[in-house]
Amino acid sequence: MGTADERRFEVLRAIVADFVATHEPIGSKSLVERHNLGVSSATIRNDMAVLEAEGYIAQPHTSSGRVPTEKGYREFVDRLDDVKPLSMVERRAIQGFLESGVDLDDVLRRAVRLLAQLTRQVAVVQYPTLSTSKVRHLEVIALTPARLLVVVITDSGRVDQRIVELGDVIDDHQLSQLRELLGQALEGKKLAAASVAVADFAGQLSGAGGLGDAVGRSATVLLESLVEHTEERLLMGGTANLTRNAADFGGSLRSILEALEEQIVVLRLLAAQQEAGKVTVRIGHETEAEQIVGTSMVSTAYGSNDTVYGGMGVLGPTRMDYPGTIASVAAVALYIGEVLGAR
């Protein structure tokens, strides 16, 4: 890339930085005063004219200054080479705060609250999806001789409980056998594969009286409730930050709040995160969701030992501190995975 192109990118970078900081359109005079660009105000004006003609910046109808466009933000993000990692003190503070969580729910609640505070945006964390989780432990408890409670604990720390209504009563010996059979079929396997194995057991024991019926009914509950109808859950924090940035969204704040409440759009974007440690930035129309078109989303996946548990990230205005937000999202995701993987 030629010298003029490099210089224009430095001008664009300065416009983005100043607009994010001030929320005021940026003129050539202020760029000369605030940044050591090494050229005259006239040269900067010419560079700004080229950037505007190419669609990287635009002029608000009431101002002589310029603001970045979605294309300008995208160019800025694509050429980031100075995403400064959080300091050791900050990282230790994050790790210690998350490690203090007593269980999965508490860890994720802490994570979403922390991320909202770090970025001053709306933070979202997807609960670990059962379909990608492995079973760490399974327990079967007799509530009555004809009613069981099946408890599944995944490697991400998620606990799910399901009631199994039996067609007949089973005794303590059969209950022990059932627990052993289900444990052999499930533990260490992803739920989709484990449920198929349980169903195979059910077929093999179809003529075994009460035990075969119990295995079959348990398999049905596990298959239908834990695999085919996986409940997608989303934790959210910092929605008040949207109100603080209301001017950034024009008249679209209501539709953004409605999209967050419905969760479907956000879950779809988080579900696309399949690689822990890789941060994705979607700017404006890149979200492909009309309800949140005035926003940007910075997201990644979290997990442990090459297993992705779920997605997480932040949602805010396109006028966002992208380097700081990217660093915060990456750090919190890393430590969520480490904390959950160690349990």
From Swiss-Prot:
It holds the Pfam family HrcA. It comes from the Bacteria. One of its GO terms (biological process) is negative regulation of DNA-templated transcription. InterPro entries: GAF-like_dom_sf, HrcA, HrcA_C, WH-like_DNA-bd_sf, WH_DNA-bd_sf, WHTH_transcript_rep_HrcA_IDD. Keywords: Repressor, Stress response, Transcription, Transcription regulation. One of its GO terms (molecular function) is DNA binding. PANTHER family: HEAT-INDUCIBLE TRANSCRIPTION REPRESSOR HRCA (PTHR34824:SF1). Negative regulator of class I heat shock genes (grpE-dnaK-dnaJ and groELS operons). Prevents heat-shock induction of these operons. Belongs to the HrcA family. HAMAP family: HrcA (MF_00081). This is Heat-inducible transcription repressor HrcA. It comes from Mycobacterium ulcerans (strain Agy99).
